[in-house]
Amino acid sequence: MAGGKAGKDTGKAKATSITRSSRAGLQFPVGRIHRLLKNRTTSHGRVGGTAAVYTAAILEYLTAEVLELAGNASKDLKVKRISPRHLQLAIRGDEELDALIKATIAGGGVIPHIHKSLIGKKGQQKTV
């Protein structure tokens, strides 16, 4: 064996890898989002590294916002588990999220709303 160091410890400590998500202080996977952005662009174009970090930060913020509002909706109904109904109430209750998310949520039900003209005044009686 001429000069090989295979299988021998050279004495240097191997540096632990730090993910781009932890560098950016995010929970969402920056590397995976970067890979998906590269694969989805036309003719596998170039995507900057900061684009993936920015996209991951946006997705994480929106997810946290929706989950917080849905958690509040489930807490108001005295339930411990978030259901699609709670997501629907949270998204449709917030004006900005409602404008952003136009999708139909399966199992979300309908938003309770009674038109003002259908509500009678307190002093009025129905005549038959």
From Swiss-Prot:
Post-translational modification: Monoubiquitination of Lys-122 gives a specific tag for epigenetic transcriptional repression.
Xref: PROSITE patterns: HISTONE_H2A
Pfam family, one: Histone_H2A_C
Entry's localization field: Nucleus; Chromosome
Start and end residues of each stretch annotated as Disordered: 1-20
Modified-residue entries (N6-lactoyllysine), positions: K12, K14, K116
Principal location listed in the UniProt entry: nucleus
PTM-bearing positions, type N6-acetyllysine: K5, K8, K12
Gene3D superfamilies per record: Histone, subunit A
GO biological process, one term: heterochromatin formation
Alphabetical keyword list: Acetylation, Chromosome, Developmental protein, DNA-binding, Isopeptide bond, Nucleosome core, Nucleus, Ubl conjugation
Keyword Nucleus set for record: yes
Biased composition regions of type Basic and acidic residues, renumbered to the chain: 1-12
A GO term, aspect molecular function: protein heterodimerization activity
Cross-link (Glycyl lysine isopeptide (Lys-Gly) (interchain with G-Cter in ubiquitin)): K122
Tissues/organs with expression: Ubiquitously expressed.
Subunit composition and interactions: The nucleosome is a histone octamer containing two molecules each of H2A, H2B, H3 and H4 assembled in one H3-H4 heterotetramer and two H2A-H2B heterodimers. The octamer wraps approximately 147 bp of DNA. H2A or its variant H2A.Zl forms a heterodimer with H2B.
PANTHER family associated with the record: HISTONE H2A
Function, in words: Variant histone H2A which replaces conventional H2A in a subset of nucleosomes. Nucleosomes wrap and compact DNA into chromatin, limiting DNA accessibility to the cellular machineries which require DNA as a template. Histones thereby play a central role in transcription regulation, DNA repair, DNA replication and chromosomal stability. DNA accessibility is regulated via a complex set of post-translational modifications of histones, also called histone code, and nucleosome remodeling. May be required at gastrulation for correct mesoderm formation.
Name of the protein this chain belongs to: Histone H2A.Z-like
Protein species of origin: Xenopus laevis
Gene: h2a.zl1
